[in-house]
Regions:
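Residue-level signal for short, function-critical loop segments
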Residues: 62-63, 150, 269
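A glycine-rich, often tryptophan-bearing local segment used as a flexible ligand/cofactor-contacting loop or short
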Residues: 119-205
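Catalytic beta-strand/loop cores that center a nucleophilic Ser/Cys/Thr
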Residues: 180-260
Length: 328
């Protein structure tokens, strides 16, 4: 499979995959994914279709992490490809941009997905304007998703008490060590077991407990009330971390906002290779679909296992950068 790479103007969508599906999926010229009447008998469910074509806007922010980690551009393309090739859901459009999205994309998005080093609206030029535009989207009921470090905020991004719109839009965030009010923890764990925490929630459909070598952030920030999740925030996945002093940490969560919008945050994957983990990938794609107000299929979003090299990462495996020379 080859992912089409084009030099689009900033804020314009990047080309989609040309891969031919083996399950009779067709991409129309309008960009809507259409499917046959039913999926494989082995799955046993009729393919669902969004009531109206929904649009997922994936925004890739800057990243300076070593090859094989974060790989935000490849991760954005991978999520788009997965949503384009869902085996049991159709009627969804996707766009990916690597800059602040143009108004036409913001106006038509059902949900906006961020991946990057720290919360991209604060990292792109004109952060206050970006947040104002995003606020307009949120007031309209648009969903929001942040993946791994895109959940993160610097101390300079937040008020002294930790307030930031992301806390309301998504229900929580990763507080960088520069934050004055709280410090979340970023540490790589050799065996982090991720456990479903809300079995009846639609985002929990079809994925089971899994263990992986990764960097699920812990001590994430959920508000000034003793760092407890707000009543409209649901813990979706937890992990007993750190191993030397374990407590139940929330590593994926969602919110249903008063403006009718939905938010979903997940603090993995750090290592690009972990996109191979089917349960993790399904959890993320379920979350995106749910925030777009699309019915999550009974067994969760079903996709083929991706070939990670297809999405043009710097590296699938982690490559440590040479240490900088020390001069006398």
């Amino acid at each position: 499979a080859v992912i089409e790479m084009t030099n689009k103007p900033a804020g314009q969508p990047i080309g989609s995959s040309k891969r031919n599906s083996r399950r009779n999926f067709i991409k129309t010229t309008s960009g809507v994914v259409a499917a046959g009447a039913a999926v494989s008998p082995a799955i046993g469910w009729s393919a669902l279709k969004a009531e109206e074509p929904s649009r997922v806007l994936i925004v890739v922010g800057p990243s300076k992490h070593p090859p094989g980690t974060h790989e935000v551009a490849a991760g954005g393309r991978l999520m788009k490809h997965g949503l384009e090739h869902m085996e049991n859901l159709s009627g969804v459009k996707m766009d990916v941009v690597e800059a602040w999205p143009e108004k036409s994309l913001r106006d038509t998005a059902s949900t906006i997905v961020f991946i990057g080093d720290m919360f991209p609206p604060n990292r792109f030029p004109n952060p206050q304007q970006n947040l104002a535009y995003l606020d307009t989207m949120m007031r309209r009921g648009v969903g929001i998703v942040c993946v791994h470090y895109a959940t993160g905020l610097h101390g300079k991004d937040v008020k002294p008490d930790g307030d930031h719109p992301l806390l309301r839009w998504m229900g929580g965030y990763f507080a960088n060590r520069s934050c004055p009010h709280h410090e979340s923890i970023a540490k790589i764990f050799s065996d982090a077991t991720i456990t479903p925490a809300a079995r009846k929630h639609p985002v929990s459909r079809g994925w089971n407990e899994f263990t992986l070598h990764d960097e699920p952030y812990i001590n994430n920030y959920f508000g000034a009330d003793g760092n407890q999740l707000a009543p409209n925030v649901t813990a979706l996945a937890t992990s007993m971390l750190p191993p030397e002093s374990p407590k139940r940490e929330t590593v994926a969560w969602c919110v249903e906002r008063p403006d009718s919008g939905r938010g979903f945050g997940i603090v993995m994957p750090h290592f690009y290779k972990n996109w191979r983990v089917e349960d993790l990938r399904r959890l993320i794609l379920n979350g995106i679909v749910w925030t777009a107000k699309i019915q999550v299929p009974p067994g969760g979003v079903r996709t083929e296992s991706p070939n990670l090299t297809d999405f043009n990462p710097e590296s699938v495996e982690f490559v440590r950068r040479p240490a900088k020379p020390k001069y006398p």
